[in-house]
Amino acid sequence: MNSMSTTGPIRVAAIPKHYLQFTVRTYTRSMASAGLRYSNPPLVKKCYDQPTGKRFISSTPQSQIKDYFPPPDAPKIVEVKTAWAHPVYSEEEMRAVTVGHREAKNWSDWVALGSVRLLRWGMDLVTGYKHPAPGQEDIKKFQMTEKEWLRRFVFLESVAGVPGMVGGMLRHLRSLRRMKRDNGWIETLLEEAYNERMHLLTFLKMAEPGWFMRLMVLGAQGVFFNGFFLSYLISPRTCHRFVGYLEEEAVLTYTRAIKDLESGRLPHWEKLEAPEIAVKYWKMPEGNRTMKDLLLYVRADEAKHREVNHTLGNLKQAVDVNPFAVEWKDPSKPHPGKGIKHLKTTGWEREEVV
């Protein structure tokens, strides 16, 4: 017999409507932000260190923020050196980076642009991002907190490191299979993937992804890797144009984050220092190691990837030399290079570099 039938009448106290609304709203917000946990206490100290007369006790074990890349357990080794030293950017060069867009000129460009727009829609949905129209930045539904920005950065960079690795891998195998040189493409593509991974590792020093974010990254990376792999086999030119358009969106994202920081919408980042891994990788000078400086460096990298991939998309994939890995006869003229001194928003045309 059901045990409920043996008990007396149960009287349920009415729950006030305003309390129910508060409970539902709080639960919804907590689930939406469950994908990320801060690993830097100052970011959340002011938000949650409210004085109360209660002592909250929980039997749930507290998660410990682990270091995603601790130093190697090797007493004889001081540091692991990288094969790709990052070029030094000046503050003037980084501030000169602008949002830009290359117009689609053929069916290949339109396929790439449409794919990026679809990917952008999915990324916005997962990260809760809504891009405001000009003049609507102060509307509440468009405002982003520090935690929400970090969630978007982590998701974006975990996916952005895929194209360079896939392209470099396929070109490496093609070079071995055909027993011919690759003309400098492999190194540039692998270096791009490494750079995007350094972006991710830097942001992971500031926040630890939760189970929801890990699941989303796993699914997105699995689908994106295989899709890009097959697409690169079919049309490398379209894939490079796709990455160029994707980096346009990345520049737009970081530009808005910088504007939010400069306008005072992200108060916890105003005096936040960049992680040590970022200081060493970008060779950040003394006095220019804040969160704002970090975002300027990352945006400059994304702008460089935008230029590189739009340029590679303009070349003949099987025969042309990678213009970012060569020594020019006349260095006094503007040419493609590893730095951002002569950065071109829409890439270099083939006639300019071949």
Swiss-Prot record:
Annotated keywords: Electron transport, Iron, Membrane, Metal-binding, Mitochondrion, Mitochondrion inner membrane, Oxidoreductase, Respiratory chain, Transit peptide, Transmembrane, Transmembrane helix, Transport
Record field: compositional bias (Basic residues): 335-344
Bilayer topology term: Multi-pass membrane protein
Main location: mitochondrion
GO cellular component: mitochondrial inner membrane; mitochondrion
Reported cofactor(s): Fe cation
An individual GO BP term: alternative respiration
One Pfam family, short name: AOX
Enzyme Commission identifier(s): 1.-.-.-
Protein name per Swiss-Prot or TrEMBL: Alternative oxidase, mitochondrial
Organism: Emericella nidulans (strain FGSC A4 / ATCC 38163 / CBS 112.46 / NRRL 194 / M139) (Aspergillus nidulans)
